[in-house]
């Protein structure tokens, strides 16, 4: 696996820009030449990188490994631009709350944050964030050919847009895929399922195999980013729609009820005990420990699953796209960490923020940071935002968990995503909480799926009318 240290990171970005580092440089020019060459990938762009030199921006991020990488390589941006970048690091839920408080108060403490795309409609409705077209179309701020926005995964861009306008850029993302233990499949003579019904049948056949492994696991923990990160894929795969053409809420429609019945039946009968309290870390750890035969969740789990020091499933795992639902659709969960510009910032800080977002989401930074080792336990990023990187031989070699892993993820991201997989409306935070409660109530048999969704539908109707 290709791995990059801090020095190697700088060398790699130079090579991406078309210049190899040269050792035979006259001493009087050494510092200048080194500076020029390590920034070559960026100096090739027709951008005035130092136009707001001396500005300082603060960014709110989560403690995830990909943001550790971004923070570790950000000194290169500071040297390139003369812009000081500082970070506050807090967990996702608290981060969203803090960002909303900052937006609402207009204090502009944070220039940008690693946001949830589902909140962009709320931000846009309150004019808390800037549309990015003016920045992208400004030739002093952006070299459109160099930046090549069209290389970014299209449906992540769609998810970061509101009413057709782009309000954020994806810095990191993921797709949900089917992850399964090949050895257990072979033991039972099973083939990877083509449909969700076949998936449930494999869960039944694999359940308690060798006396312990659960047949399958999905997120059961209550939350808009937990159980409601998975069930919407089932809802749409069953042919569901959140709203009718007349705006009527449709979560208690037949596809809603049937997909929730499926989810409950699968986990109640073939899932692990206590799955209603499981989020992705519990699922990943159980699978790695041999206690779950298969699951559907983020492709990023592969970095841990394929680490022999942490996983019994390393080298024994298969990856495939979601099986098709009754409607014939595969619908993956769509996610990216969306970086927007705080509208309350003064103009120079807005420009400084855009320069950072552009730098971070550019191909050179995405590729080099993906391979950068910020600590001895660091793993390669599996959520780069560029199609060209997913097809890059260096990157594909680094994530060669199985011969088809990269193709499975890239195809999923290109073909199985729907930006409206969850409703992108300002009321989303309320919808997310109501639906998460309903789904868990059905899972733990407090209510039938029909009753849970009828009640959720009525509650959502009330606040959607306001």
Q: What residues fall within each predicted segment?
A:
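Glycine-centered hinge/linker elements that transmit conformational signals in sensory
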Residues: 202-205, 246-277, 318, 322
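N-terminal export signals
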Residues: 2, 8-32
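Extracytoplasmic/periplasmic solute-binding protein
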Residues: 157-171, 176, 200-249, 255, ...
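Conserved C-terminal helix/tail region of periplasmic/extracytoplasmic solute-binding proteins
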Residues: 39-43, 50-52, 56, 84, ...
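C-terminal lobe and pocket-closing loops
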Residues: 51, 137-140, 300-314, 325-434
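Extracytoplasmic "Venus flytrap"/periplasmic binding protein-like
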Residues: 75-152, 183-194, 286, 290-294, ...
């Amino acid at each position: 696996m290709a791995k990059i240290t801090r020095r190697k990171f700088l060398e790699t970005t130079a090579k991406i820009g078309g210049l190899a580092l040269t050792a035979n440089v006259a001493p009087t020019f050494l510092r200048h030449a080194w500076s020029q060459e390590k920034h070559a990938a960026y100096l090739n762009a027709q951008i005035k990188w130092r136009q707001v030199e001396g500005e300082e921006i603060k960014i709110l991020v989560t403690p995830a490994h990909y943001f550790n990488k971004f923070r570790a390589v950000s000194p290169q941006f500071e040297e390139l631009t003369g812009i000081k970048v500082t970070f506050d690091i807090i967990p996702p839920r608290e981060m969203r709350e803090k960002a909303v408080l900052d937006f609402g108060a207009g204090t502009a403490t944070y220039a940008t944050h690693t946001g949830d795309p589902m909140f962009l409609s709320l931000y846009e409705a309150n004019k808390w964030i800037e549309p990015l077209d003016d920045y992208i179309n400004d030739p002093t701020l952006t070299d459109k050919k160099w930046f090549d926005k069209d290389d970014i995964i299209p449906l992540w861009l769609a998810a970061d847009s509101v009413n057709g306008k782009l309000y954020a850029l994806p810095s990191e993302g993921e797709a949900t895929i089917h992850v399964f233990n090949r050895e257990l499949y072979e033991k039972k003579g099973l083939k990877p399922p083509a449909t969700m019904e076949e998936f449930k049948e494999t869960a039944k056949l694999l359940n308690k195999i060798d006396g312990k492994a659960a047949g399958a696991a999905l997120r059961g923990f209550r939350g808009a980013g937990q159980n409601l990160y998975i069930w919407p894929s089932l809802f749409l795969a069953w042919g569901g729609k959140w709203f009718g053409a007349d705006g009527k809420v449709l979560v208690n429609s037949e596809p809603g009820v049937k997909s929730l019945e499926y989810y409950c039946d699968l986990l109640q009968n073939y899932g692990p005990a206590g799955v209603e309290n499981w989020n992705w870390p519990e699922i990943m750890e159980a699978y790695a420990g041999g206690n779950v035969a298969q699951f559907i969740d983020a492709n990023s789990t592969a970095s841990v699953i394929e680490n022999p020091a942490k996983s019994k499933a390393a080298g024994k795992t298969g990856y495939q796209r979601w099986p098709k639902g009754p409607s014939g659709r595969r619908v993956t969960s769509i996610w990216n960490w969306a970086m927007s510009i705080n509208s309350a910032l003064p103009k120079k800080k807005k420009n400084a923020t855009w320069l950072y977002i552009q730098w971070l989401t550019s191909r050179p930074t995405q590729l080099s940071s993906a391979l950068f080792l910020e600590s001895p336990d660091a793993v390669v990023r599996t959520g780069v935002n560029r199609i060209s990187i997913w097809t890059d031989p260096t990157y594909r070699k680094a994530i060669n968990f199985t011969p088809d892993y990269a193709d499975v993820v890239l195809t999923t991201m290109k073909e199985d995503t729907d930006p409206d997989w969850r409703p992108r409306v300002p009321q989303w935070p309320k919808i997310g909480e109501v639906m998460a409660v309903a789904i868990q109530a059905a899972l733990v048999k407090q209510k039938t799926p029909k009753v849970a969704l009828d009640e959720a539908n009525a509650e959502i109707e009330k606040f959607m009318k306001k």
